[in-house]
Protein backbone atom coordinates (compact mmCIF):
# COMPACT_ATOMS: atom_id res chain seq x y z
CA UNK A 1 0.00 0.00 0.00
CA UNK A 2 1.30 3.42 -0.93
CA UNK A 3 0.00 6.14 1.40
CA UNK A 4 -0.15 9.58 -0.21
CA UNK A 5 -1.27 11.65 2.76
CA UNK A 6 -3.27 11.44 5.98
CA UNK A 7 -5.99 13.39 7.72
CA UNK A 8 -8.25 12.91 10.67
CA UNK A 9 -11.94 13.63 11.08
CA UNK A 10 -14.53 13.99 13.81
CA UNK A 11 -18.22 14.73 14.02
CA UNK A 12 -20.01 17.86 15.21
CA UNK A 13 -23.67 18.60 15.83
CA UNK A 14 -23.62 22.22 14.60
CA UNK A 15 -21.41 22.99 11.60
CA UNK A 16 -21.91 26.77 11.86
CA UNK A 17 -20.83 26.78 15.53
CA UNK A 18 -17.82 24.60 14.68
CA UNK A 19 -16.84 26.94 11.84
CA UNK A 20 -16.96 29.97 14.17
CA UNK A 21 -15.03 28.17 16.92
CA UNK A 22 -12.23 26.75 14.78
CA UNK A 23 -12.03 29.84 12.57
CA UNK A 24 -12.64 32.78 14.90
CA UNK A 25 -11.77 31.43 18.35
CA UNK A 26 -8.81 29.24 17.40
CA UNK A 27 -7.74 31.35 14.41
CA UNK A 28 -7.51 28.47 11.93
CA UNK A 29 -8.35 28.64 8.23
CA UNK A 30 -11.70 26.87 7.80
CA UNK A 31 -13.25 26.14 4.42
CA UNK A 32 -16.62 24.70 3.48
CA UNK A 33 -16.18 21.26 1.97
CA UNK A 34 -18.46 18.81 0.18
CA UNK A 35 -21.56 17.36 1.88
CA UNK A 36 -21.58 20.08 4.55
CA UNK A 37 -18.12 19.10 5.81
CA UNK A 38 -15.61 21.63 7.14
CA UNK A 39 -11.98 21.44 6.08
CA UNK A 40 -9.86 22.85 8.91
CA UNK A 41 -6.31 23.73 7.89
CA UNK A 42 -3.77 23.10 10.63
CA UNK A 43 -0.19 24.38 10.97
CA UNK A 44 2.31 22.20 9.15
CA UNK A 45 0.23 21.88 5.99
CA UNK A 46 -2.31 19.29 7.06
CA UNK A 47 -6.03 19.43 7.61
CA UNK A 48 -8.76 17.79 9.61
CA UNK A 49 -12.37 17.35 8.60
CA UNK A 50 -15.36 18.13 10.81
CA UNK A 51 -18.56 16.59 9.54
CA UNK A 52 -22.19 17.00 10.61
CA UNK A 53 -23.79 14.05 12.36
CA UNK A 54 -27.41 14.21 13.55
CA UNK A 55 -26.85 11.78 16.43
CA UNK A 56 -23.45 13.22 17.32
CA UNK A 57 -21.88 12.04 20.56
CA UNK A 58 -18.86 14.04 21.74
CA UNK A 59 -15.54 12.24 21.61
CA UNK A 60 -14.41 11.24 25.11
CA UNK A 61 -10.79 11.27 23.95
CA UNK A 62 -8.61 14.05 22.57
CA UNK A 63 -9.39 14.55 18.88
CA UNK A 64 -6.81 17.32 18.25
CA UNK A 65 -3.57 18.33 19.97
CA UNK A 66 -2.18 21.77 19.17
CA UNK A 67 1.54 22.10 19.91
CA UNK A 68 2.30 25.56 21.32
CA UNK A 69 5.50 27.28 22.45
CA UNK A 70 4.02 28.34 25.82
CA UNK A 71 1.17 26.53 27.57
CA UNK A 72 0.58 29.50 29.88
CA UNK A 73 0.28 31.96 26.99
CA UNK A 74 -2.02 29.59 25.07
CA UNK A 75 -4.31 29.06 28.08
CA UNK A 76 -4.38 32.82 28.76
CA UNK A 77 -5.37 33.54 25.15
CA UNK A 78 -8.05 30.83 25.10
CA UNK A 79 -9.46 32.07 28.42
CA UNK A 80 -9.65 35.62 27.03
CA UNK A 81 -11.68 34.20 24.14
CA UNK A 82 -14.12 32.53 26.54
CA UNK A 83 -12.70 28.99 26.37
CA UNK A 84 -12.69 27.10 29.68
CA UNK A 85 -10.06 24.49 30.41
CA UNK A 86 -11.16 21.07 31.65
CA UNK A 87 -10.25 19.89 35.14
CA UNK A 88 -8.92 16.32 35.41
CA UNK A 89 -7.77 14.22 38.35
CA UNK A 90 -7.36 10.57 37.41
CA UNK A 91 -4.35 8.28 37.33
CA UNK A 92 -1.20 10.26 36.64
CA UNK A 93 -3.17 13.19 35.17
CA UNK A 94 -4.01 16.02 37.54
CA UNK A 95 -4.61 19.55 36.33
CA UNK A 96 -3.84 22.63 38.37
CA UNK A 97 -6.26 25.49 39.07
CA UNK A 98 -5.72 26.81 35.53
CA UNK A 99 -6.49 23.42 33.97
CA UNK A 100 -2.89 22.58 33.09
CA UNK A 101 -1.30 19.17 33.77
CA UNK A 102 2.40 19.71 34.50
CA UNK A 103 3.56 16.52 36.23
CA UNK A 104 4.17 13.90 33.53
CA UNK A 105 5.49 14.71 30.06
CA UNK A 106 5.01 18.11 28.46
CA UNK A 107 2.56 20.58 30.02
CA UNK A 108 -0.90 20.09 28.51
CA UNK A 109 -4.39 21.58 28.92
CA UNK A 110 -7.68 20.29 27.56
CA UNK A 111 -10.83 22.10 26.47
CA UNK A 112 -13.92 21.28 24.42
CA UNK A 113 -15.26 22.55 21.13
CA UNK A 114 -18.95 23.57 20.87
CA UNK A 115 -19.85 19.95 20.03
CA UNK A 116 -18.17 18.71 23.22
CA UNK A 117 -15.15 17.13 21.50
CA UNK A 118 -11.95 17.20 23.57
CA UNK A 119 -9.03 19.26 22.24
CA UNK A 120 -5.68 20.08 23.82
CA UNK A 121 -2.87 22.57 23.74
CA UNK A 122 0.45 20.96 24.56
CA UNK A 123 3.75 22.74 25.12
CA UNK A 124 6.87 21.78 23.22
CA UNK A 125 9.65 20.33 25.36
CA UNK A 126 13.28 19.65 24.53
CA UNK A 127 13.78 15.95 23.87
CA UNK A 128 10.06 15.23 23.52
CA UNK A 129 8.19 14.97 20.26
CA UNK A 130 4.44 14.79 20.17
Q: Where on the chain are the PLM-derived regions?
A:
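Amphipathic alpha-helical segments
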Residues: 16-29
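Short secondary-structure junctions
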Residues: 27-32, 85-87
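Short amphipathic alpha-helices within nucleic acid-binding modules
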Residues: 21, 71-77
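Short glycine/proline-centered loop/turn elements that form peptide/ligand docking sites
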Residues: 17, 35-38
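Helix N-cap motif at beta-to-alpha junctions
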Residues: 14-15, 68-72
